[in-house]
């Protein structure tokens, strides 16, 4: 039992939060690319992504796992993004700080998604059973390249002073 739920139910909730974070995160990033705040989507993205990272620590394990390290890094990026957006109102350099933090948090969620896909999808598992094989590495490099590009473009295009209505 985790938080009063069976492990299966808790896992379902964790995965649902993760998928909501990824879906809303992409909507937020595409909003950033067109200089739109998308306040509701942003709140959904930030809350579900924080909850995804936080609930990852509640799974019964006996040692610190790589997924915990990613969750810690994600929570750091999310904390910075949340402060930049809501405490510092994206003034000056906080605008870029917010964009970078949000994109990094979404990247970490997608990074773990790729890991999970290679663990759970039989075809992908066959291609990279230990996740040290070229197909896994190529997939992760492609995801990283996409997020680096999205982050750079979003940071250049998102303008807090001349933002369009949400």
Identify the function of each model-found stretch.
Residues 2-166:
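Polytopic transmembrane helical bundles with strong interfacial aromatic enrichment
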């Amino acid at each position: 039992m985790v938080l009063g739920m069976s492990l299966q139910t808790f896992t379902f909730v964790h995965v649902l939060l993760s998928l909501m974070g990824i879906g809303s995160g992409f909507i937020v990033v595409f909003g950033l690319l067109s200089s739109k705040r998308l306040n509701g989507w942003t709140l959904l993205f930030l809350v579900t992504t924080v909850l995804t990272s936080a609930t990852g620590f509640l799974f019964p394990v006996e040692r610190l796992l790589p997924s915990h390290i990613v969750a810690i890094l994600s929570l750091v990026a999310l904390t910075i993004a949340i402060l930049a957006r809501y405490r510092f109102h994206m003034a000056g350099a906080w605008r870029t700080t917010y964009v970078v933090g949000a994109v990094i948090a979404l990247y970490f969620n997608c990074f773990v998604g790729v890991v999970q896909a290679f663990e759970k999808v039989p075809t992908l598992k066959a291609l990279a059973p230990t996740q040290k094989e070229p197909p896994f590495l190529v997939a992760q490099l492609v995801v990283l390249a996409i997020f680096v590009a999205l982050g750079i473009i979003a940071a250049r295009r998102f303008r807090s002073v001349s933002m369009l209505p949400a």
